[in-house]
Amino acid sequence: RIGLVSTHMYKQFLDYQHATINTNEIFTRMIDNLQEVCEILKEAFSSRGVTTQNIYVDTDPQKSIVIINILWHKISFTTRCNFQPQALYRENGAHMFSGRIMAIRGNYNEIMAGVKDHDEEMVRLLDNEVASLFVPAESSQNSVLKIRHLANRELYLNQVDAPREFVLKVVETICGGGFYHEEGARKSFNI
């Protein structure tokens, strides 16, 4: 029986390695897409006479976090939630081992101030999550985009288009909404 367990764990390990490679490749392309979005927004706002000093992209040296600041909005993307093999639950039982790129509302570094372990990190990530892109080990298999405010409805994206589509969908979700004046309970809205 231990032989079966080791075979199962070895397959998980291989899937984890391949998913990590695919996830990192997509994340690197997302950084390029975010730079492009940033430049387009700078052009659009400067042509209207709006200062663009609050429109920028910042990455960490390990390329595991990228933050885009768009005027008063801050959006962070991270791969730091991939510290062990994990699968995306499937109703049919064919769970998909995958890497995950999380999009969160706010500045990752500010949100994680004082975090001491992975459990606490995940609680804060999930509390601020906007969407997640699940990247499978097999590069020919579609990635799965889940958007939190759409009841985690799943969108399937091929791994070529996934970086661009994920970036655009998250930017649209965050910047396409707005905030109400605070009056008791804090609320936001999406268009």
Which residues are covered by each model-predicted region?
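Short, structured protein-protein interaction patches enriched in aromatics and acidic/basic residues
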Residues: 49-74
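Contiguous, amphipathic alpha-helical segments that mediate oligomerization or scaffolding
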Residues: 2-57
